[in-house]
């Protein structure tokens, strides 16, 4: 997607604080964090929202989310964290590229 900020981050056109990356996903620190350690898991393939993502990819993404959540918890010595995923403007989605907030 030409206008997608997350696609531009994934393609290296916009710098990011990457904390993990593999062939399928990129995990970055949020530029405007809601809290310390606020990270985003971005699929490298563009999906506008959860309604477009296939179950296999979603399964791998949530497996990664568990790993990232444990890393954030241990690194920052926190007791709890939220996982948030918005779909559609009415739900608060501001970037039309599926992503998971931790």
Report residues per predicted region:
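HIT superfamily nucleotide-processing domains
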Residues: 1-102
